[in-house]
């Protein structure tokens, strides 16, 4: 069946926050948070304006995701507004790859440091287990200390590095740390 997720939590500062799977109706807000977060940090994959996603594309993507049994997009909602998203996707449909899922997350900088990243990450781990994955994977820019600490805290371990993983517009290299979490 499809992957469903819904959790109400209270952040460390007392703010109520809802984690739930994103659907087609969230397209506008999910796209807004994608575009916003990509202007706020150098640590994400795409530059602002590089993603050709329209609200229509996003609707289709979220509709597919909502109907899928092996991928999910979870949003963090505060006061009716989406402030962050995280998701898991299948790495490959071949039999030898089906146990592996990839994890990605982005959160509005205004909400950093409040435990939302941790809550979203734990939600995705739970969903990955439910979907039958036995390994969750991610890459993180080496300088992104806060993200690395979070991933280590929830149990991810480093298995390799790519010293030239990203190349920035200024021509600098960003080293990527490859991390994995065994779920079985």
What are the language-model segments listed below?
Residues 26, 80, 115:
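Conserved G/P- and acidic residue-centered "switch" motifs that form tight phosphate/ATP-binding loops
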Residues 1-15, 170-184:
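Terminal substrate-recognition subdomain of acyl/acetyltransferases
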Residues 24, 32-49:
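Helix-loop element at the rim of GNAT/NAT acetyltransferase active sites that forms part
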Residues 117, 121, 143-147, 164-170:
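Short glycine/proline-centered loop/turn elements that form peptide/ligand docking sites
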Residues 17-29:
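A short beta-loop-alpha structural element at the N-terminal edge
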Residues 12, 50-110, 121-122, 127, ...:
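Acetyl-CoA-dependent GNAT
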Residues 121, 128-139:
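Conserved GNAT acetyl-CoA-binding A-motif
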């Amino acid at each position: 069946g499809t992957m469903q997720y819904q959790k109400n939590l209270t952040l460390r500062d007392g703010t109520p926050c809802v984690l739930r799977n994103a659907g087609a109706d969230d397209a506008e807000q999910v796209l807004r948070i994608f575009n916003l977060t990509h202007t706020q940090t150098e640590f994400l994959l795409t530059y602002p304006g590089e993603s050709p996603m329209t609200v229509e594309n996003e609707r289709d993507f979220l509709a597919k995701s909502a109907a899928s049994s092996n991928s999910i997009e979870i949003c963090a909602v505060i006061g009716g507004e989406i402030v962050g998203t995280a998701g898991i996707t299948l790495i490959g449909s071949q039999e030898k790859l089906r146990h592996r899922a990839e994890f990605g997350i982005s959160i509005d900088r205004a909400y950093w440091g409040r435990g939302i990243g941790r809550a979203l990450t734990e939600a995705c781990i739970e969903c990955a287990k439910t979907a039958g994955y036995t390994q969750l994977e991610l890459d993180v820019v080496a300088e992104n200390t806060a993200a690395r600490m979070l991933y280590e805290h929830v149990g991810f371990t480093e298995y390799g590095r790519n010293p030239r993983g990203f190349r920035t517009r200024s021509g600098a290299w960003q080293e990527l740390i490859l991390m994995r979490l065994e779920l079985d």
